[in-house]
Each structure stands twice: as structure tokens, then as C-alpha cells.
Amino acid sequence: MKSPFWSWNGRIAELKETAKATGVDLEAEIRLLEERLARLRKETYENLTPWQRVQLARAPGRPTTLDVLEKAFQDFIELHGDRAFADDPAIVGGLAYLEGEKVVVVGHQKGRDTKENLQRNFGMPHPEGYRKAMRLMDLADRFGYPFLTFVDTPGAYPGVSAEERGQAWVIAQSIQRMSRLRVPAVTVILGEGGSGGALAIAVANRVLILENAWYSVISPESCAAILWRDAKEAPKAAEALKLTAKDLLQLKVVDAIVPEPEGGAHKDPDRAIRNIKEALLKALEELKGLSPEALYEDRYRRFRSLGAFAEP
């Protein structure tokens, strides 16, 4: 997403260079421009369109699951493989500590560059990825550890190989398995939350979403291609899908919005990760003390209430 502020930044930099070269005091003019730029940035980022937020959710440099695990957790030990076919690098998971508490973590993992994106299939899991996630769900249940997931995927991989290995069936199994957890479950949507590929690891007691992330049954481009026969209508589709954090909170699809640094999480990943950690700890505190049966019932009620409405 191209910054609309480059001309302002350029003008401020030019004035600073002029002041340095000539010795003329331009401090007042520079301060005035910086104040105007700050107001403009605030107004712009508070009023982004849904399509602009989708673009921010896809921005290179946003925190990935492994970034969060490295900076917000301690002693992460990654576990590999589904014990049936292969290890899927599009989903990572394992054991870790969060402020001294043992947890099990699972998340989609995109690459940080083209080479890694190809290796991780752009964060689009195969069936073995979801089987690995279910293996970790069983581990969390067996030892009574909270189960934390991080969502960032355009969707489950739709290729022939994945379909041959039962992609739809495995996603359904993962949804069912997570819904039956007897431990606290919290999901954070980091960037993209595309369709069943996201929902498969998002059936949690608390679902949190970053300010510029999106979560929907379909991507705007695919929706536009179906409804308007033209993927270029994606901005219109993004508006209609109600996929932004603000819309999702209003619809009670998510429980809380995690604030991002101005300009998006990719502008200051460390600060974004600190915000994620704080939100996770708060969500876990809310669930602390609930019995396994109460956690199950809480999750059941949460998802059964989605889409409920009253006749006028």
C-alpha cells in the first residue's frame, strides 16, 4: 500500500536540509508541517476503507506466528509432522511458556520473502497441516495446557493434491476437534483470515483480531469474481463482506480488537507483538478458573449465538 504522505515527508526533509546548509532557523515551519502531517496520518488511518485494510493485512513485514512466538513467548519447542503423511511448514506449532505458564501453540506461517513463501506455500496449509494442529490439540487436552492459535492465511490450499488427501474432511475434523477442547482456547487473527482454512484453528473461547486484519468466508477477489465476474471489483466486495475488525466486533464474530501501531503492524512489529501479548494474557485471565465443562459450554454458546437475530 503506497504511503500518501511521501510529499509531506519530502518537504519536511527538504526544510531540514536547507536549515542545516544555510543556518537559517526554520524550526517553526518544520514543527508546523510535522503537526499537520501527524493530524493527516491520524485521520487517514482512522478512516481506511475495507479494501485498504485488506492490503495492510497483506503487507510484508507484519508479525508472523514465528515472530510472535520468538518475542512474546519463552522456550518455544516446535513439534513437526502429523504422524500420517508429512510435516506441513504452512502450519507451525509446539510447546512454549507465556509468562511462566505452559501453553500449546499453533499458527499459520507465511514466508518472509519469496523463497520462504514458496517453501511455506504462502501460508496455505495442506491436510497434513491440519492433522498436525489436531495432534497438538490432543496434546493440550491431555496435559491441561491452554491452547493458543494464530491465524494468517488466504485459505486452505485448494490444489488437486490437497483435495486427494481429503482437505475438506480434515478441515471439518479440525473444527470439530477444537470445538471439544476442555482447556482454555484463544485465537488471534494476525493478518488474513480466509474461509475454512482459518476457521479450522479458530474455534476458540476468545477470538481476537489485529486492527487491520480481516476474517471472512471468502477473499474479496474471489467474491468479486463470483458475484461481479470481475476480480477488479474486490474493493466493492470487501465493503459488502463486512470483514474488517470493526465490523466483526459489531457482529460479535470476534471478542476484541488488538490495536496496531500507526500505519499498520509492519511499521513497528515489536510494538504490535507487545499488544498481542497483553491481549492474550487478558483473555487467558478471563478464562482462568473455569472448569473443563464450563470452557466447553462457553465455546458452544459463543458459536451458537453467531447470526442470531430477533424478529422485529
From Swiss-Prot:
**Does the keyword section mention Lipid metabolism?**
yes
The annotated pathway is:
Lipid metabolism; malonyl-CoA biosynthesis; malonyl-CoA from acetyl-CoA: step 1/1
The catalysed reaction is: N(6)-carboxybiotinyl-L-lysyl-[protein] + acetyl-CoA = N(6)-biotinyl-L-lysyl-[protein] + malonyl-CoA
Q: Which GO terms describe its cellular component?
A: acetyl-CoA carboxylase complex
- The UniProt entry lists the main location of this chain as cytoplasm
PANTHER family to which the protein is assigned, alphabetical: ACETYL-COENZYME A CARBOXYLASE CARBOXYL TRANSFERASE SUBUNIT ALPHA, ACETYL-COENZYME A CARBOXYLASE CARBOXYL TRANSFERASE SUBUNIT ALPHA, CHLOROPLASTIC
Its name, as the record gives it, is: Acetyl-coenzyme A carboxylase carboxyl transferase subunit alpha
Species in which this protein is naturally found: Thermus thermophilus (strain ATCC BAA-163 / DSM 7039 / HB27)
